Regions:
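Extracellular repetitive beta-rich solenoid segments
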Residues: 1-60, 108, 132, 192-196, ...
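Extracellular jelly-roll beta-sandwich "head" domains, especially the C-terminal globular C1q domain
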Residues: 57-219
Length: 219
């Protein structure tokens, strides 16, 4: 085997040697033309060209949180939470405000767009109440792959029991989505109740109806 031996002025050396087994073909590695920056590592493009690149830091690359701020009442109907001005990032104590981790979600008319391709965990929670009665409530995450046609991808089904006045309940659903096209892949949220009047408890100071988005991996 051949070695490239670099000898220090103090007498000791560092050697670069060939693989333990015979390569399947001749290999040529091309060194980069410039030094990298602190913390970078040398990587190959798969064809022998070497370059310096920053290594992933680990952990989440994006985390975002939005809440619905408006309380509203409806009877035996469906509402899509599509009022742009009723969605905000939490600005209460320790809230993210305008500072999501990484590049956050964008929202227009209650339709949420993703900042980049990847795997995202979506969590949607609601709070609601009814006076002197019981009813069924439903919450939904809907998704589109063509920026037009939406389908339900997650739902909760719950009954508010008539045990006191008012009667409260909370729901929680989640969905792991694989986003490959940020122009066409989007999500929105929907609430529904049967029968009597139900109040959906949006709030500008607390997360009562809220959505959390976590990017958990790249594609």
């Amino acid at each position: 085997m051949s070695n490239i031996k670099l000898v220090h002025s103090g007498g000791n050396s560092v050697s670069l040697t060939t693989p333990d087994s015979n390569p399947a073909a001749n290999r040529t590695f091309k060194l980069p033309g410039a030094d990298g920056t602190s913390g970078q590592a040398m990587v190959t493009d798969g064809s022998g060209a070497l370059s310096f690149a920053s290594m992933p830091s680990g952990g989440l690359s994006m985390a975002d949180n939005w809440r619905w701020t408006t309380e509203f009442t409806q009877s035996n109907t469906t509402s899509f939470l599509t009022t742009t001005s009723s969605w905000e990032r939490p600005d209460s104590k320790l809230g993210i405000g305008a500072n999501p981790l990484g590049t956050g979600m964008t929202q227009s008319g209650g339709i949420f767009s993703f900042p980049s391709t990847g795997y995202y965990l979506i969590h949607f929670m609601t709070s609601s109440k009814v006076d002197n009665d019981y009813c069924e409530i439903f919450t939904f995450i809907q998704a589109t792959e063509n920026n037009s046609d939406y389908s339900v991808v997650a739902r909760s089904l719950d009954t508010i029991q008539n045990q006191c006045t008012p009667n409260f309940t909370s729901t929680s659903i989640q969905y792991l989505t694989r986003v490959t096209n940020i122009s066409n892949h989007k999500v929105r949220f929907r609430v529904q109740n049967s029968g009597i009047s139900v109040t959906w408890m949006g709030n500008t100071d607390e997360n009562r109806i809220a959505a959390t988005f976590l990017k958990v991996g790249d594609i």
